[in-house]
Amino acid sequence: MSTNNSVLVLKVGGALLQCEMGMARLMDTAAAMLANGQQVLMVHGGGCLVDEQLAANGMETVKLEGLRVTPPEQMPIIAGALAGTSNKILQGAATKAGIVSVGMSLADGNTVSAKIKDERLGLVGEVTPKDGTYLKFILEQGWMPICSSIAMMDDGQMLNVNADQAATALAKLVGGKLVLLSDVSGVLDGKGQLIHSLNGKQIADLVKQGVIEKGMKVKVEAALEVAQWMGQAVQVASWRDASQLIALAKGEAVGTQIQP
């Protein structure tokens, strides 16, 4: 598949929303990229905000194999926290950095097809790329889409999608280069040291050993899927590390490279 190197897909985790300095630094990096003609698409989660909102409503958070279980009664709260609050916090940070952004969700513009991922998870969605017209139009204007991971089935039912998996679908759709940013510098080994490069076999071994588990397992498997689809490495890196962001802006490799 041909890769459009002018689209960089940045996935950011919910922890970023609780770090004003981290958000400002990341948005300044994105603004510099956009000024250089780099198209940037941001995809976000918001797990910490979801947890807060659920707790405030007397509801508990349950996870299964690193994925949030989403009972129907929690869906409106999760959608509000992700497509509403989280999205607008990031849009505010983008505006402050001088970026023209478009707040959106996976449900917009016929962008993806969505279905229930696993009945045990409730209203958790699995998405596949559908139509890139809407996204490509936004990117061509030099604007930055900021996309939440709320999707919609053909019958109008909202679904909660894991943000790493959402970013995977959008990277495939626009043929972009994917970077999964979280609050850790990349994939760490059993001793807490950064692993600079991983392939499918090494990932399977580390999962078996319990070194890669839960949310990182979901993240790394999403990265591997895109790496194999695109035939190019996907980066797992940190928004906390200013030097990684500067290297990223220059197009250099950062964090852990997930190899196809």
Curated annotation (Swiss-Prot):
Its EC number is 2.7.2.8. It comes from Shewanella sp. (strain W3-18-1). This is Acetylglutamate kinase. The keyword GTP-binding does not apply. Pathway: Amino-acid biosynthesis; L-arginine biosynthesis; N(2)-acetyl-L-ornithine from L-glutamate: step 2/4. It catalyses: N-acetyl-L-glutamate + ATP = N-acetyl-L-glutamyl 5-phosphate + ADP. Catalyzes the ATP-dependent phosphorylation of N-acetyl-L-glutamate. Substrate binds at G46, G47, R68, N160. It comes from the Bacteria. PANTHER family: N-ACETYLGLUTAMATE SYNTHASE, N-ACETYLGLUTAMATE SYNTHASE, MITOCHONDRIAL.
